[in-house]
Amino acid sequence: YYEGTTDITRTFVLGPLTDKQKLHFTTVCRSNLNLADAKFLYGCSGLNLDILSRGPLWQMGIDYKCGTGHGVGHILNVHEGPNGFRWRVVAERNDSGRLEEGMITTDEPGVYLEGEYGIRTENELICVKAEKNEYGQFMQFENITYAPIDLDGIDPDEMTCREKKMLNAYHKMVWEKISPYLNDDEREWLKEYTREI
């Protein structure tokens, strides 16, 4: 696509969930939000930030075998270095470079239980400058994926107040960016899927 390249994943609830499935769905969402909200000093790579995403899952004794995210090229490859998020260096991957302004990186934590189910929430983040002060140049991310996270999979009791605010703010952004392009029926659907929790 000459307009650019994107990568997105959503898991949608299609029936009743067990308590375990709902806990995993909620924790994946929390992991995604935590990384997206990072503020960090210039010079960090995804190796420094990966724990923000994996942390909630590691607290449960769960991990996913892949990286948390990868760089995204423009009219090139969907998976492209030198940026990415993972907790350890993998020699054959070119994804441990410093995060620079304008780099786009996916944020895609997940839970994958063989023979049972998989859950992933994936957005794209663009690295932007935040404030500069006596400690140095701070960086942060802006979310550039505008698709709702299925609230039927979320247990608000498993989220902190901060995480609920982040999810509500994300859904407000989705509504504001997407609703002007939809017809009445589509707007009603989006309104339900971006409601506050």
Question: Which residues fall in each region the model found?
Answer:
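Active-site neighborhoods and metal-handling regions in enzymes and metal-associated proteins
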Residues: Y1-I197
